């Protein structure tokens, strides 16, 4: 009889301890969630990129206006610089798209392997390999 009373008491103490621990954990999680600085949204980042690109193009145009048409090489240098900048940006976008595509393929393959409720056997989604191409080497 003593053991049954002791077990109830221990069970209540353990449940109270777990409840307090869960409450503290939840409060700490909320605290750290709201204390962390907010990440900039993709819309704001896109606007910043477009603004910086416009400034860069304006600066190149003004630089070309300031150079008198003594020689055609100055305007071609600005054009080549702009072309290189665009090539670097496109290469970065391509690399990010390849990474994103690989992540999506990984999720699709793992999701279809885990979903066996439809009765089909085997993996119907083809596993893609790394499709990364070196674009920066081909653009000059």
Swiss-Prot record:
Location(s), subcellular: Secreted
A Pfam family it matches: MGT5A_N
Coiled coil: none
Glycan-modified residues: 110, 134
UniProt cross-references to InterPro entries, sorted A to Z: CCDC126, MGT5A-like_N
Gene Ontology CC terms: extracellular region; membrane
Keyword set, alphabetical order: Glycoprotein, Secreted, Signal
Primary subcellular site in the record, as a coarse category: secreted
Domain of life: Eukaryota
The keyword Cell cycle belongs to this UniProt entry's keyword annotation: no
Entry protein name: Coiled-coil domain-containing protein 126
Species per Swiss-Prot/TrEMBL record: Homo sapiens
Gene: CCDC126
């Amino acid at each position: 009889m003593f053991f049954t009373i002791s077990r109830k008491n221990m069970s209540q103490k353990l449940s109270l301890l777990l409840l307090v621990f869960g409450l503290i954990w939840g409060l700490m999680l909320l605290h750290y969630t709201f204390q962390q600085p907010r990440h900039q949204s993709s819309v704001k980042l896109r606007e910043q990129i477009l603004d910086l690109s416009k400034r860069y193009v304006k600066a190149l145009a003004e630089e070309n206006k300031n150079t008198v048409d003594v020689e055609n090489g100055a305007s071609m240098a600005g054009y080549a610089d702009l072309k290189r900048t665009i090539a670097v940006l496109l290469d970065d976008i391509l690399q990010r798209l390849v990474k994103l595509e690989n992540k999506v393929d990984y999720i699709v393959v793992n999701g279809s392997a885990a979903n066996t409720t439809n009765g089909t056997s085997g993996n119907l989604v083809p596993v893609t390999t790394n499709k990364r191409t070196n674009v920066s080497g081909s653009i000059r």
